């Protein structure tokens, strides 16, 4: 029986009512191999390559063919015409519009990659070289060519004298600024080498961690201490972001607002909000302030970057500013180790806030500055007090920043004239005495420094012009101070007037506001997430 009859009878046996009847296979049809198997078998049958006696290739094998078919590109305008072009008037108009919105902290530029940013940003820092004015073309090329004339950037002696005067004035201004910054410094006195403990936060490892966080973040939160916002700002990082990473967003968070009154916090927020979006914040897992505003602005940035699967938010700032505490507050549980001492966070750490927002904790950094003295670095919380040698030398700075009545109320002592007498009275009251009844000034000084940095002693630095600003803040409402969280105050103390120090470091003797109770603040829900003069509820 032939193949055709066998196949036909097989279909009859299987039944014609099947949904998928078998295909009728005809003799001569290759249904055992597919096209891939056939190509492989043909390669085997092609044989090996043939070579002559000289070893030259005579006939290549099937898989050794080096002949390439001629390729031809489709004559399409998509490949041979300009794709993104813009006329000069349109570019000028767009540059002017960008210049008005570029410096606005509340304007966000989307789809930056599709814009010719190199054409929009003119590099005006490089001065133009007036070649033809300083060196004419005829004296450079041609029969009269000579290059004996020096290349100068001015045309006449008057311009030379003017430029010399400007350089001399700039040099004298730098000398005056140096004298004002270091009034005790003279040319005959050489400053001693700074203790290595005051270089904390400036190591190469710390800066490597910082740049990892900056590179990995879409939004950066700079955490400031509400008691000294200007002293805890990282100007070096802000300039780096402005020049090298302008596509990243910056937010300022004024932490520890429970240690300052509402008027001062509102004044600082109003000043800082002119540069970046600013939020007043109090880090606490159970009783926080500003949490809703911060989450709202992070949601806004996440919605702006809808093309990304998620965004990363990095927290940077000085040591002991409260970066890890803010993350714990947002998560409402302890996910980062926190301590009232600087240097608790050693490496960066990723924390998931929600599905599309991730937080990055960064170690504290201290930008190097020649204007910061050892006492200022210590009082900013950069250095651990237990590692400082001769801590009693920094007590005069503490006494100059705090009011006498605040120290009297905190330590229940009075009647001292200098720092030595203050430490002696405090040591005798606490029973910290050495052999022979001598006061242990070192241990008492460390206790005072810890109380100063942890908020037990009321103090802070207010903005300049707070007393003379009659528009937003009453002249009688000057810088105020408040005791730390958990301190018990009776009604008589709550009615007491509070004073602080202005930005120039001088004590303020006029009337001021009353202290604000902890946790009594209402969160603002405006678009810029900025706290103004709202009562805390």
From Swiss-Prot:
This is Nucleolar GTP-binding protein 2. Residues 207-368 form the CP-type G domain. The modification Phosphothreonine is found at residue 484. The modification Phosphoserine is found at residues 186, 487. GTPase that associates with pre-60S ribosomal subunits in the nucleolus and is required for their nuclear export and maturation. Keywords: GTP-binding, Nucleotide-binding, Nucleus, Phosphoprotein, Ribosome biogenesis. GTP binds at residues 317-324, 361-365. Residues 468-486 have a biased composition (Polar residues). GO terms for molecular function: GTP binding; GTPase activity. Belongs to the TRAFAC class YlqF/YawG GTPase family. NOG2 subfamily. InterPro entries: G_CP_dom, GNL2_CP_dom, GTP-bd, GTP-bd_ortho_bundle_sf, NOG2_N_dom, P-loop_NTPase, TRAFAC_YlqF/YawG_RiboMat. It is found in: Nucleus, Nucleolus. One of its GO terms (biological process) is ribosomal large subunit export from nucleus. One of its GO terms (cellular component) is nucleus. The gene is nog2. Residues 1-24, 468-537 are annotated as: Disordered. It comes from Schizosaccharomyces pombe (strain 972 / ATCC 24843). Its main location: nucleus. Residues 487-496 have a biased composition (Acidic residues). Residues 497-512 have a biased composition (Basic and acidic residues). The keyword GTP-binding applies.
């Amino acid at each position: 029986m032939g193949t055709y009859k066998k196949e036909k009878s097989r279909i009859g046996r299987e039944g014609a009512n099947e949904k998928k009847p078998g295909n009728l296979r005809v003799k001569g049809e290759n249904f055992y191999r597919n096209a891939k198997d056939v190509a492989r078998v043909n390669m085997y049958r092609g044989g090996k390559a043939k070579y002559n006696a000289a070893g030259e290739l005579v006939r290549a094998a099937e898989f050794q063919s080096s002949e390439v078919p001629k390729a031809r590109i489709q004559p399409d305008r998509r490949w041979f015409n300009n794709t993104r072009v813009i006329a000069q008037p349109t570019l000028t108009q767009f540059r002017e519009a960008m210049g008005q919105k570029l410096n606005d902290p509340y304007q966000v530029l989307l789809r930056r990659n599709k814009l010719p940013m190199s054409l929009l940003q003119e590099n005006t820092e490089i001065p133009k070289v007036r070649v033809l004015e300083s060196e004419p073309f005829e004296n450079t090329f041609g029969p009269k060519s000579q290059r004996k004339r020096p290349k100068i950037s001015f045309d006449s002696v008057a311009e030379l004298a003017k430029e010399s005067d400007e350089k001399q004035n700039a040099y004298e201004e730098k000398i005056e600024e140096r004298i004002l910054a270091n009034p005790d410094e003279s040319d005959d006195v050489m400053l001693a080498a700074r203790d290595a403990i005051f270089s904390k936060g400036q190591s190469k490892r710390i800066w490597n961690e910082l740049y990892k966080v900056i590179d990995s973040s879409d939004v950066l939160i700079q955490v400031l201490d509400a008691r000294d916002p200007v002293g805890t700002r990282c100007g070096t990082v802000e300039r780096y972001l402005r020049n090298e990473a302008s596509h990243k967003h910056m937010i300022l968070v004024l932490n520890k607002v429970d240690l300052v009154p509402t008027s001062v916090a509102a004044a600082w927020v109003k000043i800082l909000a002119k540069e970046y979006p600013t939020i007043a914040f109090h880090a606490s897992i159970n009783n926080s302030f500003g949490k809703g505003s911060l989450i709202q602005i992070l949601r806004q940035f996440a919605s702006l970057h809808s093309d990304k699967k998620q965004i990363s938010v990095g927290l940077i700032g000085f040591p002991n500013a409260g970066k890890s505490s803010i993350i714990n507050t947002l998560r409402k549980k302890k996910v980062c180790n926190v301590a009232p001492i600087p240097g608790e966070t050693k490496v960066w750490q990723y924390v998931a806030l929600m599905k599309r927002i991730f937080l990055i904790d960064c170690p504290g950094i201290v930008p190097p500055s020649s204007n910061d003295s050892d006492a200022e670095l210590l009082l900013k919380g950069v250095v651990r007090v237990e590692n400082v040698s001769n801590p009693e030398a920094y007590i005069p700075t503490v006494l100059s920043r705090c009011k006498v009545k605040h120290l009297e109320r905190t330590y229940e002592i009075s009647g001292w004239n200098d720092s030595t007498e203050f430490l002696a009275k405090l040591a005798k009251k606490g029973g910290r005495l050495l052999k022979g009844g001598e006061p242990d000034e070192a241990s008492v000084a460390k206790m005072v420094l810890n109380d100063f940095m942890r908020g037990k002693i009321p103090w802070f630095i207010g903005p300049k012009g707070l007393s003379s600003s009659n528009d937003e803040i009453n002249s009688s409402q000057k810088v105020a101070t408040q005791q730390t969280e958990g301190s018990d105050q009776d009604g008589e103390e709550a009615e007491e007037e509070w004073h602080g120090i202005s930005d120039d470091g001088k004590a303020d003797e006029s009337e001021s506001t009353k202290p604000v109770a902890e946790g009594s603040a209402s969160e603002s829900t405006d678009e810029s997430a900025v706290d103004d003069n709202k009562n805390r509820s």
